[in-house]
Every structure is written in structure tokens, then in C-alpha cells.
Amino acid sequence: MSSVLTDLLNLDLSDVTEKVIAEYIWIGGSGMDMRSKARSLSGPVSSVKELPKWNYDGSSTGQAQGHDSEVILYPQAIFRDPFRRGKHILVICDAYSPNGTAIPSNKRAAAAKIFNEKAVSDEETWYGLEQEYTLLQKDVKWPLGWPIGGYPGPQGPYYCGVGADKAWGRDIVDAHYKACLYSGINISGINGEVMPGQWEFQVGPSVGISAADELWCARFIMERITEKAGVVLSFDPKPIEGDWNGAGCHTNYSTKSMRKEGGFEVIKKAIEKLKLRHKEHISAYGEGNERRLTGRHETADMNTFSWGVANRGASVRVGRDTEKEGKGYFEDRRPASNMDPYIVTSMIAETTILWKP
């Protein structure tokens, strides 16, 4: 990139204008593709309520017909923009038809209804989302660092590995980590995964629907960073067939009752509810998850529900600290890396708090 272009991209506008750039972000028709466009605001904003609604051509995103293509964006969450910096912002939006009804691909609206239920809000649901992903070489769609058409050595040395022959893509990972912290996303950590070229970042603990807003924004930031790096970001739950780990989005969850004394009994009752609705959850936990949930590579078989303490081959894992202290949280290990966090987080809350067997 030329120095002139770099200088222009890094221009500090604060001395010449009060205007602020807002990048409006939404989810496209596939349910995983992220879209965005920017607009100028007259000045800084302190609340999402100050932001105007906007619209876009839904016929170009698979979300509307050409003869009636306008879809309306409702701003829902604000984050600092790590690319433009200054007072510029990223805005997570959801999408509605002109008559005010949520379009079918808008999963946030239904999630918000669940999280706004008094029984749910009173429980102050906490989520920690472990987003696994794979970095691919742009032109061949093969994992970063792998020989083209070939394979690296067997799994073993790559998980949390260090070294040029074990960890590929660390600059991207660290850039993303810092960008999320700058943005105000509650990112809590990163690590290299079992399959080389695969990494993980964690968001949370965050309360209610904010966990999903933060994960979608973190995904957007990663998409932008990999775009800049010339690398393809994949959320495929099983990007490479064979003796290689898949990619999930393990979802850690607790309620106020679970975090109190005697909470372990509440956890066990919640897990029993999840068992009774196992099929419904599996069907909503990500496309292609059957390629990942095979009972191998630290997964449970998708057709069987199981849970255990410290068991990473179970559907639901309870940590040893939770068992020892008699309170805490549990981890739902079933969601795939391409899951929609609005669906998964709200469904877990609905099943464990609202649903009556």
C-alpha cells in the first residue's frame, strides 16, 4: 500500500469536522454473511437511541424481492471503530420490513423477546462464547500454513503451540484481540486450536443479548482484518475431513440461581431440561454440525445427549470447580462455529428458565 494511501486512511478528522462516521452492520440472507455500509453523522453519539434508522437493498442480500426491495436497519448496539478510531463507531443493527415486522433472517428480534421476559431478566443470564474459526489461504481455500494439496504433521503439537512450524496466523489473531478490546467488546482470551490454522477467541462473560451483539461485532472485526491480510475466514464446523478437529462455539452459561449457594442442583435441573429438548437444540445449533458431532475429536455424538464433570466428550460439560463449590456454570459443547448466537443464547435461556416439561 502506498504511503499516501496509508496517510489518508490514518487522517485525524477531529481538527477539521465534528462529523462522525458510523459503520452500520447487519447479517445477510445466508444467516452468516455480514454486510455493512457507512454514513456520516453530524456529531458524536452517546446512545444507540440517538442513531437514525437506515435502509438497504434487500434484493441484493437475499432478503427481499426486487419489486419491493427496501429493508430497514434498526441500530441496536454501538462499539468503537478500531479501523477509523477517533469518535467513529461500529453499529450492530437488525433488519425489518417497512411495516415494522422483523424479516425472517432477523433472529435478534425473537431473542430480545425472550431476554425481556421478567423471569429471564431477573436471572441475569451470563454467557461466555468460545468462537473457533479457521484461517484459509485465499486462492486455494486450504488452511493457513498447510502445504497446498498436502497435510501437516498429525494433531498434537498445535494446541496453544508456539513456533513457526506450529502456529500460523498469530498476527491476525493478536490484531483482532486488540481491536476487540479497543471496540469495547468483552473479549476474554485467545488460543491456538488443536487443528493447525484453527484458532479461538472468547467473548464474555456478558449479560443477556449483549453477548450475541458482541460476538457478531467480533466476527465482523475479524472479517475486516482477514480481508486486509488477504486471508479467508471460515466458520465451517468441519473444514477438513478426516482425523482433524472440527470448529465449535462452546457456550458457557449461568443464571443468578446457579451462581448462588446450592446452584449445582439448579444446574442439574437445567441440564435435564436440555436433555429433553436435545433434538430441538441440535437442529438450531448450526448448519453442517453433523459433520462435527461424531463422538470423536472432543465431541459427543449428535444423536445422544450426555453430560459429565470435566468431560470434553460430553454434550454438556460441568467444570470441576463448579462441582467442588456447589455453584457456578456449565458449558454446552454442541453449538457449531457457524451458529447464530442470538438463537443459541436465547434458546438456552428459554429452555432452562421458561420451558415447562
Curated annotation (Swiss-Prot):
Gene3D superfamilies: Glutamine synthetase, N-terminal domain (3.10.20.70), Glutamine synthetase/guanido kinase, catalytic domain (3.30.590.10). GO terms for biological process: glutamine biosynthetic process. The keyword Cytoplasm applies. Its EC number is 6.3.1.2. GO terms for cellular component: cytoplasm. It is an enzyme of class 6 (ligase). SMART domains: Gln-synt_C. It is found in: Cytoplasm. It comes from the Eukaryota. Pfam families: Gln-synt_C (PF00120), Gln-synt_N (PF03951). Keywords: ATP-binding, Cytoplasm, Ligase, Nucleotide-binding. The keyword Ligase applies. InterPro entries: Gln_synt_N (IPR008147), Gln_synt_N_sf (IPR036651), Gln_synth/guanido_kin_cat_dom (IPR014746), Gln_synth_cat_dom (IPR008146), Gln_synth_gly_rich_site (IPR027303), Gln_synth_N_conserv_site (IPR027302), Glutamine_Synthetase (IPR050292). Disulfide bonds: none annotated. GO terms for molecular function: ATP binding; glutamine synthetase activity. It catalyses: L-glutamate + NH4(+) + ATP = L-glutamine + ADP + phosphate + H(+). Residues 107-357 form the GS catalytic domain. Residues 20-100 form the GS beta-grasp domain. Homooctamer. Belongs to the glutamine synthetase family. Irreversibly inhibited by the herbicide L-phosphinothricin (PPT). This is Glutamine synthetase cytosolic isozyme. It comes from Pinus sylvestris (Scotch pine).
